[in-house]
């Protein structure tokens, strides 16, 4: 990134509509590398650092020269990009060609380019002389989208901007695909990746490191938000390697059915969702049922003496005593004394969603816009509520998040508990979350970080002095109290195989994390910085941000104010051109946010430049006026 741009800002105000200095510095790098040099870039910015706005600002710049295609994972993230495109346009302060920008979900892009599951090669010519931006790029490989991207790269010879806060998902294989997509050479995966008998033994070898450094030199942008902008994370539980884990000791009932399930899987449990299930909660005959829909139709079927299922509804005293789930027993007991909002991750949405709903209802927590809990717990005179987010409810997710993130819900009085499966692991932002729970051990280090990154990010907290609490729950045997202090103690399969499922998963996660961190450090070292005058294509965008910052602190100045002129000439060296620019923003009534008057427009008054506050007024009973670009104005073919 261009550190010369960062040096132009002093005490940047982040609390107003703004482009952050590192975003502008990265934008400069993207324009030089992708547009000027026609080279692909991996935007490896850690979650919460604003990759989306950077990508959209770049798309606006690039639209003046080429067509830009933006691919996002699903329809909900498409809505987020559409909204943020409006935000980016409002901050852009320069010309762009909206008709040259197309935003697709991967599903719609597949439909556009496949006929009967066969690529329509004749239609690919539309992508000549274009640029592709791919969000969550680590997820496109191993499916039709990844295949299509490779074909377009080879046929159209175009550059890609790949966005990822975690370019390695499970193994270095993902990184190998990224290298292949970004470079002009075809990669032989057998030469760069060494494979053992287990997934954790998949490593980027020395040849792979050299290929990585050679082919991606000058193509990596790495950035991590400084800790000073984020709240402290407080991990709970006992020390487990370099983190903390809450050991949830199973009851005799749970341990018995847990072991039955495990024995039936004959040590293949790492790859079976039933082990996820019984580590969360045991449900008797449901434990090994793959067709849960059939069992959900049973009427008054007894699972345990104190637990039955009737037409998909669980009921019985066991939902309160919670011998079926050591994790939920800990969770229910702990939340009674906690204040603030909770975000709870779990996997296997059908089984997990069933367990969560009826445990929460039975213990006095009410379903948001649904059933009321037994003897409901209250906050500010209203029931404490929960919602369960799975892929089956995508249509209502946006509205639900609006409620959860609203300032009125900072204390959780509208919606306190948000349970989510993998659908929430990427691209969404949660605000003012004070407690993050892992009911399921994530499969990968990137998934773990993505879940944390939904909440722990810049602008998500009004008060960063208050810590965020993280609870990583592991179901363990009733007599299990092992201290896990070193990975070297668990190099033999015999030692690992006797461990509880969750502890095995944690160890595998840490083994894979070791390799992931090694590669990430290489990528970080490859990220280049330079100090140059801003690229001509972003000068107006940069000046717009400098002006916003200046007039935040200045309500009224002389027209020939030396500080304003000095600021503008730091970018436009010619003083006459700088004065002309000042004339343009004043006569054009540039929009700023002022610390005294809030939303304001610049005006000339006698020999002064003043900030004039404004507000939008309307007659009663007006149906609707679209004052903001809330929706995407960019069309799609």
UniProtKB/Swiss-Prot annotation:
<comment type="similarity">
    <text>Belongs to the helicase family. VETF subfamily.</text>
</comment>
<keyword id="KW-0347">Helicase</keyword>
<dbReference type="Pfam" id="PF00271">
    <property type="entry name" value="Helicase_C"/>
</dbReference>
<dbReference type="GO" id="GO:0044423">
    <property type="term" value="C:virion component"/>
</dbReference>
<keyword id="KW-0010">Activator</keyword>
<feature type="domain" description="Helicase C-terminal">
    <location>
        <begin position="327"/>
        <end position="507"/>
    </location>
</feature>
<dbReference type="GO" id="GO:0005524">
    <property type="term" value="F:ATP binding"/>
</dbReference>
<dbReference type="InterPro" id="IPR002464">
    <property type="entry name" value="DNA/RNA_helicase_DEAH_CS"/>
</dbReference>
<keyword id="KW-0805">Transcription regulation</keyword>
<keyword id="KW-0238">DNA-binding</keyword>
<keyword id="KW-0946">Virion</keyword>
<comment type="subunit">
    <text>Heterodimer of a 70 kDa and a 82 kDa subunit. Part of the early transcription complex composed of ETF, RAP94/OPG109, and the DNA-directed RNA polymerase.</text>
</comment>
<feature type="binding site">
    <location>
        <begin position="45"/>
        <end position="52"/>
    </location>
    <ligand>
        <name>ATP</name>
    </ligand>
</feature>
<protein>
    <recommendedName>
        <fullName>Early transcription factor 70 kDa subunit</fullName>
        <ecNumber>3.6.4.-</ecNumber>
    </recommendedName>
</protein>
<keyword id="KW-0378">Hydrolase</keyword>
<dbReference type="InterPro" id="IPR014001">
    <property type="entry name" value="Helicase_ATP-bd"/>
</dbReference>
<dbReference type="InterPro" id="IPR027417">
    <property type="entry name" value="P-loop_NTPase"/>
</dbReference>
<keyword id="KW-0426">Late protein</keyword>
<dbReference type="GO" id="GO:0004386">
    <property type="term" value="F:helicase activity"/>
</dbReference>
<keyword id="KW-0804">Transcription</keyword>
<keyword id="KW-0547">Nucleotide-binding</keyword>
<feature type="domain" description="Helicase ATP-binding">
    <location>
        <begin position="32"/>
        <end position="185"/>
    </location>
</feature>
<feature type="short sequence motif" description="DEXH box">
    <location>
        <begin position="135"/>
        <end position="138"/>
    </location>
</feature>
<dbReference type="GO" id="GO:0016787">
    <property type="term" value="F:hydrolase activity"/>
</dbReference>
<dbReference type="InterPro" id="IPR006935">
    <property type="entry name" value="Helicase/UvrB_N"/>
</dbReference>
<comment type="function">
    <text>Acts with RNA polymerase to initiate transcription from early gene promoters. Is recruited by the RPO-associated protein of 94 kDa RAP94/OPG109 to form the early transcription complex, which also contains the core RNA polymerase. ETF heterodimer binds to early gene promoters.</text>
</comment>
<dbReference type="GO" id="GO:0003677">
    <property type="term" value="F:DNA binding"/>
</dbReference>
<dbReference type="Pfam" id="PF04851">
    <property type="entry name" value="ResIII"/>
</dbReference>
<dbReference type="InterPro" id="IPR001650">
    <property type="entry name" value="Helicase_C-like"/>
</dbReference>
<keyword id="KW-0067">ATP-binding</keyword>
């Amino acid at each position: 990134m261009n550190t010369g741009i960062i040096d132009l800002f002093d005490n940047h105000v982040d609390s107003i509509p703004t482009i952050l200095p590192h975003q502008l510095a990265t934008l400069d790098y993207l324009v030089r590398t992708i547009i000027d040099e026609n080279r692909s870039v991996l935007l490896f910015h850690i979650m919460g650092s604003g990759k989306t706005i950077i990508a959209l600002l770049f798309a606006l710049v690039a639209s003046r020269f080429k067509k830009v295609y933006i691919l996002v994972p699903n329809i909900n993230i498409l809505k987020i990009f559409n909204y943020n495109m409006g935000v980016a346009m409002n901050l852009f302060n320069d010309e762009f060609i909206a008709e040259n920008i197309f935003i697709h979900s991967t599903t719609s892009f597949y439909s556009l380019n496949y006929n009967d599951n066969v690529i329509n090669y004749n239609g690919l010519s539309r992508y000549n002389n274009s640029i592709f931006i791919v969000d969550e790029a680590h997820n496109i490989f191993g499916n039709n989208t990844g295949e299509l991207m490779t074909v377009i790269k080879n046929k159209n010879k175009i550059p890609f901007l790949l966005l990822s806060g975690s370019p390695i998902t499970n193994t270095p294989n993902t990184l190998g695909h990224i290298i292949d997509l970004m470079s002009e050479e075809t990669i032989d995966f057998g030469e760069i990746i060494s494979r053992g008998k287990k997934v954790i033994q998949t490593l980027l070898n020395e040849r792979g490191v050299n290929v990585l450094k050679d082919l991606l030199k000058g193509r990596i942008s790495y950035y991590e938000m400084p800790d000073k902008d984020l709240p402290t994370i407080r991990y709970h539980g006992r020390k487990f390697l370099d983190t903390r884990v809450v050991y949830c000791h199973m009851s005799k009932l749970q341990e018995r059915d847990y072991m039955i399930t495990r024995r039936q899987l004959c040590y293949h449990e790492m790859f079976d969702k039933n082990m996820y299930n019984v580590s969360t909660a045991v449900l008797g005959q449901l434990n090994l049922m793959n067709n849960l829909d059939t069992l959900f139709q049973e009427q008054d079927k007894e699972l345990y003496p104190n637990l039955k299922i009737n037409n998909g509804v669980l009921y019985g005293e066991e939902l309160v005593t919670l011998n079926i789930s050591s994790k939920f027993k800990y969770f229910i007991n702990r939340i009674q004394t906690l204040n603030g909002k909770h975000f709870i991750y779990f996997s296997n949405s059908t089984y997990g969603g069933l367990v969560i709903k009826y445990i929460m209802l039975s213990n006095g927590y009410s379903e948001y816009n649904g059933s009321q809990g037994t003897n409901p717990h209250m906050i500010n005179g209203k029931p404490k509520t929960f919602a369960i987010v799975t892929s089956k409810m995508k249509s209502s997710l946006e509205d639900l998040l609006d409620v959860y993130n609203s300032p009125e819900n900072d204390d959780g009085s509208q919606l306190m508990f948000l349970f989510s499966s993998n659908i929430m692991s990427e691209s969404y932002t949660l605000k003012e979350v004070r407690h993050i729970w892992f009911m399921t051990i994530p499969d990968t280090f990137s998934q773990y970080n993505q879940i944390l990154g939904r909440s722990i990010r810049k602008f998500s907290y009004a008060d960063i002095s208050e810590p965020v609490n993280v609870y990583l729950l592991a179901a363990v045997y009733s007599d299990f109290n092992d201290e896990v202090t070193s990975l070297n103690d668990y190099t033999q399969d015999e030692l690992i195989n006797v461990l509880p499922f969750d502890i095995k998963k944690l160890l595998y996660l840490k083994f894979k994390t070791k390799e992931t961190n090694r590669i990430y450090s290489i990528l970080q070292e490859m990220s280049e910085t330079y100090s140059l005058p801003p690229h001509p294509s972003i000068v107006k965008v940069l000046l717009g941000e400098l002006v916003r910052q200046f007039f935040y602190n200045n309500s009224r100045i002389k027209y020939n104010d030396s500080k304003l002129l000095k600021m503008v000439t730091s970018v436009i060296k010619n003083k006459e051109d700088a004065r002309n620019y000042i004339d343009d923003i004043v006569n054009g009534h540039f929009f700023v946010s002022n610390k005294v008057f809030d939303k304001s427009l610049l005006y000339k008054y006698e020999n002064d430049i003043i900030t004039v506050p404004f507000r939008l007024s309307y007659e009663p009973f007006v149906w609707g006026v679209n004052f903001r670009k809330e929706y995407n104005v960019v069309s799609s073919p």
